[in-house]
Amino acid sequence: MSVPFAISFLLLILTMPIGGQESNPDSSLSPVVEASWAAAQRAQQQKDYATAEQEYRKVISLSPGFAEAYMNLGLVYELQSRRQDALAMFEKAVRLKPGLAGAQFLLGVDYCKLGDAKRATPHLEAAVRARPDLPDAWTWLASAYQVTGRTSRKVDTLQAGLGANPHSIDLLYLLGQAYQQLGKDAVDRIQQKDSESSFLAQLLAENYAVSGYPSVAMLHLEDALKASPARAGLHIEMAEVLLHAGNLKRAEDEIAAELRLAPHSLRALVRLGEVKLLRGDVPAALADWSQAVALDPARSEAILGVREFGFGDTSQEKLTENLRAQLTGLRSQIESQAGPASRLALAFISTQEDATRAVASATGAGDSDSVKSVSPCALRQIRTWLATDLLQLVAACSAQMLKQPLAADLRLEIARALYETGLPEPALAALDGLAPAQVDSPQAQYWKARCYKRLALAAYLRLFEVDPDSYRAHQVLGDMDEAREEDSKAVEEYEKALVKRPTLPNLHYQIGHLEWKTYKTPEAREQFQAELAMNPRHTGALFDLGSTYLQERQADKALEYLKRVYDLDPKYPDVHQFMGIAYTRLNRYAEAEKELKIAAPSDKDGTIHYQLARVYLAMGKSAEAQREFALSNQLRVVTHRNNEERVQRIAAAEAALKQP
C-alpha cells in the first residue's frame, strides 16, 4: 500500500468534529484550545505544515492529555516525511488513548514501511478492533501477517475484514492472493517430501492443462502414471486432455483404463457418455448420462461444465471447432428426447456454443442435492459409498463422521468427497484433522492445494461481482495473462489498473519485470524506479534494477542494488549468484568466490559451477577450477539429455493430441 493510500484513512478522522471525539479525559476543551485546533486543521488542509505544527503544539501545551492532537501532529510530520518525529507523536497518542484507531493504524503502517512487521502487528490489531469498518486497516494487518510468514492468520484476518466490509475489492484480491500462496506452499511441501510423487506430477499437469499447454500436461500425467500406475484419477485426467483436443479413440482407451481401476467412477461414466455423443451415438450417450444423473445430478453437471459449484473451476473446456459443429448438428435429435439426460445434453451443447452459459441446473438438481441428509452414517456404509463413488452421501455424513477418530485413509477420502461436491472449506478442516505426520503426506497436500485454488477462484469471482471494471479486476486479469505468458496482454491490464489507481503497489514492478524479459531496459528501469519511489524496500524491483546494470556490465551500479536486496532478504533467489558475477567483473575474486559458493547448491544446469571455476582460474587455483569445471560439465550433460528427452516427449504428445 502506498503512502497516499494509507493517509487517506486519516482524512476521515481529521474531518471529524471535536464533539465527536473523546477529547480531554478530564474536561471539555477550552475555547482557546478549540481555536488552535481549528486553526491547525485549516493550515493542514492548506498544506501550511509549519503553521499546523505550531497550532497543534499550542493545543498540546494547553491540553497535554488530548491524544488526538498528538496523532494529528504526527500526521503533519508524516506528510513532511519526518517519520521518526511522526512515530514519537503516534506512540504518545496511543499511550494516552489505546483505542485511538488512527494513531494505532499509522504506527502500524510506519513500522511496516520500516520492515518491522512484527512490531506493526499489535498496533494494526488495535486499529481493526477500534474501527472494523475501515478496509485499509485490515489490509495492512493482513500484509503484516504475510511478511511474518503467517499466511493462515492472514486469511483469517481478511475473512474477518470482509465480514465488516463485504464489498472491499482490496480485501477480496488479497484473500485470493493468500489462498494462492497457501496452495503454492502445499505444492512446495510435496516437492520437499517427495519430488517424484505422482501427486506433484498430477498438480503440475492440472496447472498446465488449464493454462493452455495440453502437451506438457500429458507429460506430467505420464510421469504420474509411471510413479503410481494403479492410482485412480490419473487415467481420467489424461482422457480429458485428449478429449478436449479431439483424440476420441485415445480418450476412450484412457476412460476404459480408469474404469478398470475404479468401476464406479462417475467422472469416467460422464466422460464416456461425452465420447459417445461426440461420435454421434445419441442413444448410448443418453443411456450413460441417465445413469450418471440418477447417481449424482449436480456432480454430473459440474463435470461437463454445465454448472458450477460457485468456484469458477468446472472441468469444462472448449472442444475443437469440428467437434462443436458436430454437437450442434445433434441438437434436433436430442430435443426429441425427454428426461434429465437429454436436458443435460442440450445444456452441454449450449455451453460449448457459449462458454459463459453455465446454468444453475440442467437436470433439476438443487444445490442441496449434493449434501442432503442421510441416515445412518455408519463407518461401513461410508466405505461402501466411497467405493461406489456416491460422494454426495459421504459429504452429507462428513460432519458426524469427522467427530470420531478415523483411519488416515478414510479421513483423506472424506476430504476428497467434500472437495468433489463443492465444499473446499470443510475439506480443509477434514485434512487439518490428520495427525502431524499424515497431514504432510503428498496426498493430503495435493487435496489442500486443490482446495486453496478453488477458494482463490471464489474470492476473485466475488471481486468481479462487486466491480468487474475495478483496478483490482484488471490486476487479476493481468495476473492471469502473465501466468499464461501472454505478457503484452498482462501489461495492458496492469496499465488499466494503474490508470484507475496510480499508487497501486507492485504493479509498476510487474510491468517492469515483463518489459525486462524482452530487454526493454529503459522502459523497465522507469517502472522499477516508480515502484521504488513508493516502496524503497521492494526486493523484486531492486533485484531486477540491479540485473539491468549487470547486463550492461555496470557491475558497481548493479552491486548497489543487489546489496540492498541481500540486506532486506539474504535468501532472495539468485542474489548470491548475481553478486558473485558482479564481483567477478570487478576482479574482486575473493568476494566472488564467497557468493558463488553460497549459490552453488542451487545450481541446476552447471552455470554457477562454471562461473566459480572461472573465478578459481583467475585466482590461480587450478585444482579447484578443474573440480568446478567437472561439476559444471556433469550438470550440463544431464540438463542437455533431459531437455532433449522433454522435447521428444512433447513432440509425441502433440502428435497424439492431433489424432482424431
Q: What are these model-predicted stretches?
A:
Residues 62, 96, 130, 164, ...:
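Structural marker of alpha-solenoid helical repeat scaffolds
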Residues 72, 106, 140, 174, ...:
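Canonical tetratricopeptide repeat
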Residues 31-62, 79, 200-211, 346-349, ...:
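Alpha-helical segment of the N-proximal tetratricopeptide repeat
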Residues 162-165, 173-181, 193-194, 283-300, ...:
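TPR/TPR-like (Sel1-like) alpha-helical repeat modules
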Residues 33, 67-68, 101-102, 135-136, ...:
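Helix-start (N-cap) detector for alpha-helical repeat units in TPR-like alpha-solenoids
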Residues 24-27, 181, 185, 189-199, ...:
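Terminal, low-structured helical/coil segments at or just beyond the last alpha-helical repeat
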Residues 46-58, 79-92, 113-126, 147-160, ...:
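Structural signature of tandem alpha-helical TPR/SEL1-like repeats
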